[in-house]
Regions:
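A short, basic/flexible loop-to-alpha-helix module at the beginning of a structural domain
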Residues: 1-7
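C-terminal catalytic/substrate-binding lobe primarily of soluble NAD(P)-dependent oxidoreductases
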Residues: 7, 154-346
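N-terminal Rossmann NAD(P)H-binding glycine-rich loop of SDR-like oxidoreductase domains
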Residues: 8-31
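Structural motif
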Residues: 9, 79-80, 105
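Conserved glycine-rich Rossmann-like NAD(P)H-binding loop of the short-chain dehydrogenase/reductase
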Residues: 32-45
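Short, conserved SAM-binding/catalytic segment
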Residues: 49-56
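Conserved Rossmann-fold cofactor-binding substructure of NAD(P)-dependent oxidoreductases
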Residues: 62-91
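Glycine-/Pro-rich loop/turn segments that contact NAD(P) or position catalytic residues
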Residues: 87-204
Length: 346
């Protein structure tokens, strides 16, 4: 990071969006001494949001996602930029570039792995050289999966053969998340969606790992929990992130295991529930893969809208990890969270 005095410790970009508003209120409530600001293109909306903050009212910075000068100004006056401006492949490319140039760390909550792959290809070497941290996917996608796997391995202090993660939870979906799903199918490299090691460095996985890491679509009984597994909608995002983390640790001689394999599923109590979820995901996949998918977009939640406060408060998530080690032992670890996983918990 460039050695310069900065006005703020944190700037939230895209603060007036659905998830950005939640983050703004959270920061105001929990960090009364933080030097921070909220940023976006609409001054009136930013002022209205800032006026809702009663403990630590943020400053306001104007910045449009298509205006490089404004974005670079934002990056030059803060240590960290936290972006909620999705779809990120449309609205955060210039922001990441400005953060890299101005020496500000960048974080977001994207689940758009194809876009993340582009970030890695374009910026990884420069970010490493400049000491800038570019950290996508810092929400429910993919923190529980990534951190849960990390702490599972570190707490055992053993080399691992495999981790199977089973996700369950309750909550809602915002229009921005749905828009991101539609957007990714229109992205220039959408044909890479099935690449199970999309985010890995070159030559960082074996044929055995590739064979055991194929995306899973079947329904199975989970003997350890007496429940059922189904395909998890965010597994294609989370698995790629965990596999990249494992590969990066391995490059630093501190890996999870030489042939480490990670897979992820949804956990449900009943077979019928697993069947319904699996069928629904197939239908959703067909809808967003159709050439005329945009005709179906009005059927879903609009950008800017999302779960009610009651739904967010009553939401929850559980991440369960079945870990098999190289000494042929099996362990179980669990992670819990209160609040809607994609919003309040995030």
């Amino acid at each position: 990071m460039k050695d310069k005095t900065r006005n703020f410790q944190l700037i939230i970009f895209g603060a007036t969006g659905f998830t950005g508003q939640i983050a703004t209120k959270y920061i105001d409530h929990h960090y009364p001494n933080l030097k921070w600001a909220i940023a976006g293109r609409n001054k009136d909306k930013l002022e209205d949001l800032a006026n809702l903050c009663k403990n630590n009212k943020p400053d306001i910075v104007i910045g449009d996602s298509g205006n490089k000068a404004e974005l670079c100004h934002i990056a030059s006056i803060t240590k960290v930029v936290l972006s909620f401006a999705g779809p990120f492949n449309k609205y955060s490319n210039l922001l990441v570039e400005c953060c890299l140039n101005e020496g500000a760390h960048y974080l977001d909550i994207t689940g758009e792995n194809i876009w993340v792959k582009d970030l890695i290809d374009r910026h990884h070497e420069a970010a490493e050289k400049n000491g800038v941290k570019i950290v996508p996917s810092c929400g429910y996608d993919s923190i529980p999966s990534d951190i849960g796997s990390f702490f599972s391995q570190r707490s055992l202090d053993k080399k691992i053969l495999s981790i199977d993660c089973y996700q369950s939870g309750g909550g809602g979906v915002s229009g921005g998340t749905i828009e991101s799903a539609f957007s990714m199918m229109e992205y220039k490299t959408q044909n890479k969606l099935g690449h199970t090691f999309l985010l890995n460095p070159k030559n960082s996985y074996s044929n055995i790992q590739r064979e055991k890491s194929k995306d899973k679509f079947s329904i199975k009984k989970i003997k350890h929990f007496n429940t059922w597994s189904a395909p998890f909608v965010m597994a294609p995002a989370n698995t790629r992130v965990v596999r990249r983390s494992a590969a990066l640790f391995d490059m630093r001689q501190n890996g999870y295991g030489e042939q480490f394999v990670y897979n992820e599923f949804m956990e449900l109590k009943k077979y019928t529930s697993a069947l319904i979820v699996s069928t629904s995901l197939v239908m959703l996949g067909l809808i967003i893969s159709l050439p005329f998918r945009r005709l179906f977009r009005p059927l879903f939640t609009k950008p800017g809208n999302g779960p009610s406060e009651k739904t967010q408060d009553n939401g929850w998530f559980k991440s369960k990890f079945i870990i098999k080690t190289e000494d042929n032992k099996t362990y179980i670890s669990k992670m819990y969270g209160k609040g809607d996983p994609g919003y309040k918990s995030t």
